[in-house]
Amino acid sequence: PTIYDVDLTYITPRGSWYAASWKGDPCKSGGVAANIGIHFIDMLHWIFGPVEKVVLHHSSPECSAGFLQLKGARVRYFLSVNAAHRPSPNDNPMSPYRHLVINGEEFDFTNGFTDLHTLSYERILAGRGFAVEDTACAVHTLDMLQKSAAVGLTGDYHPLLRNLQG
């Protein structure tokens, strides 16, 4: 079976309100991986299968980075709410940066998320939402990450992590 190499980068800058709100408190929100990363963790499970191993490289109130070994992929991820973590300047530093590389092929999915929550809520209200069983794998992975101690720059870590650590 093919094992894919995946780099996931999601940087969605937030204003000062974020740290002052419940979202900025890891005890209330579950942290960055739960708040902004759970959807991507879920997507990766749907595509590449269940988790086999997790490694947390970095965890702070504004950033989470780590490695996920899934049945069909090795995933290095970098999640942040800090605009300064963007890999390159942008006309609007507050706009999201969503980037996926699979076996060297780049996918920029920065656009197209405008009404995602609205569509999801409409489907839920129409009785076509997701069941707990549909998300259990992602929630289990998130739980494993939240119970992990950050190991720093060891093993197979996301390249943007060097900017934070060095």
What are the functions of these language-model segments?
Residues 46-54, 77-82:
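Short Pro/Gly-enriched beta-strand edge/turn motifs at strand-loop
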Residues 57-61:
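A short beta-turn/loop motif at secondary-structure boundaries
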Residues 98-104, 117-126, 136-137:
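An anion-binding loop in the catalytic cleft
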Residues 64-115:
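C-terminal substrate-binding/catalytic lobe of Rossmann-fold NAD(P)-dependent oxidoreductases
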Residues 122-166:
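C-terminal helix-rich "cap/oligomerization" subdomain common to oxidoreductases
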